[in-house]
Amino acid sequence: MNQRDPTLTPAYQWWLTALLSANFGFVLFDRNALNFLMPFVQPELGLNNTEIGALAGCLSLTWALAAFAVGYVADRFGSRKRLLVVSSVAFALCSFASGLAPSFLAMLGTRLAMGVAEGGIMPLSQLLIAAQVDERHRGVAMGVAQGLGSSLMGSFVAPVVLVSFATAYGWRHAFFLAAAPALVVALVIAFVVRDTPQAASSEEKAPAHVRGAFWQSLAESNVVRCVALSILFVSYLVVTWTFMPMYLMRVLHYDASTMSWLMGALGIAATLYSFLLTGLSDRIGRRVVVAVTSLLAFVLPLGTLLHSGPPWTLAAVFFVGWTFTGAMPLVMATIPSESVDVRNIGSALGLCMGGSEILGGVLSPLFAGSFADHVGLQAPLYWLLAVALLSCLVAVGLRETAPQVLARGATLQRHAERQ
C-alpha cells in the first residue's frame, strides 16, 4: 500500500490509473467492435439472431473462465504486470484475427480466444490499484480504471469510428484498426508500471470490518450481493450492446450514422459516470449510489419502447438510463475489495467478474437472442426491464464499506457514547 511506500507518489498513482484505464478502454473497443459492426457482418456471414447472441456469449464464457483463473493465480503466484502485458498483446492479435474470419465458426473461434486474452485484464488492473493507490481515493481510482477508458473508447469512440471506417473501407479493415493502439499501450505499461508480485499486501492487517478466511470471504454477504449485481449489470450491458444497434436500424429505421451516434451517447454517459459517481461514493457511500443507479436503469428500455420523437430525445433517455455503469466498478471491484481479507482480493474480484460474465454475459445474449427470434427485436428491451427490477431488489441489501463513510460513522458513535 502506498501509505508504507513513499515512492508511490500521488502523481504515480494517477499515472498508473490513467494507463490501466486506457488499456481497458482498448479492451472494450475491441470487444464491442463486433456489436457495432454487426449490421455489416450479419449479411456477409449470414447470421441469425441466435448466432449473434452466441458470438457475444462465447466471448463472455472464456472471459469469465480467464477472470476466475487469473484472479486466483495473481493472488498466489507470479508477476501481475507480466500477466497484464501478455494478455494485452494477445487480445490485440485476436482482434486482428476477427477481421480475417470467413464464416460464423471462424468468428466464433476468434471470439473465444479473445475472451481468454481479455478476461484477466481488469482483475489484474484492480489488484494493482488496490495495492498501489491510497484507500481514500480507491473508489474513484477503480472507477476510472474500469469505467472511464472503457466507456470513452468502447462505448463512444468505437461506434463512431468503427462504423464510419466500415462504411468507407469495409468491416474487416475496421477490426484491423481496432488492434493497433492496444499494442502501443501494452508497451507503455511494460516500461512504466511497477509490479506487485504475489499477494503484496498479504502481510497487511485487514480493516476491522473485513472478514477473515478464504471461504468465509467468498461467502460474505456483500460479495454474494456484488456477484448477483455484477451478473445483472453485465447482462444489461451485453444485451444492450448486442441488440440495440439492430433495434435502432431495423425497428426505429435510423441510418448507420445516427445509430452510431446514439450508441456513442452511452459512451459519453458512462465516461462521466465512471468518475463522478465513483468519486461521489467515496463521500456519501457505495450503497446509496448502487441503489439509485439501479432504479434509473428502468429509463433506457422503457423510454426506447415508448419513443416516438427525434433522435436527440432518445439520446437523453440513453444518457439517464446508463447511470448504472457508474456503479459497475463499485460492485465488481471496490465493494468486494473492501469486504474481504486483503490476501483474497484477487479471488473475490475474479468471482464477481467471472461469475458476471458466465451468467450475465454468456446466457443473457443467448436467451435474449432466442427471445428476439420468436417475438421480435423489442424482446431484449423487456429483458432489460426485468434486469433493472432485480438489481433494485439486490442493491438495497448491501452493507456500506466506504472508508470515509465508516470513519464518519465511527466518530459519530464515539461522540454519542461520550454523551
What function would you assign to each model-found segment?
Residues 34-35, 222-271:
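Extracytoplasmic gate region of multi-pass secondary transporters
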Residues 145, 149-191:
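Helix-loop-helix hairpin linking two adjacent transmembrane segments in secondary transporters
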Residues 287-332:
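C-terminal transmembrane helical hairpin of 12-TM major facilitator-type secondary transporters
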Residues 57-72, 264-276:
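Central cavity-lining transmembrane alpha-helices of secondary-active solute carriers
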Residues 65-102, 281-287:
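Conserved MFS/SLC helix-loop-helix module at the cytosolic interface between two early adjacent transmembrane helices
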Residues 2-10, 196-227, 415-419:
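Juxtamembrane intracellular "pre-TM" segments in multi-pass secondary transporters
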Residues 46, 78, 100-106, 253, ...:
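Helix-breaking motifs and short loop linkers at transmembrane-helix boundaries and internal kinks
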Residues 110-150:
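Cytoplasmic helix-loop-helix junction between adjacent transmembrane helices
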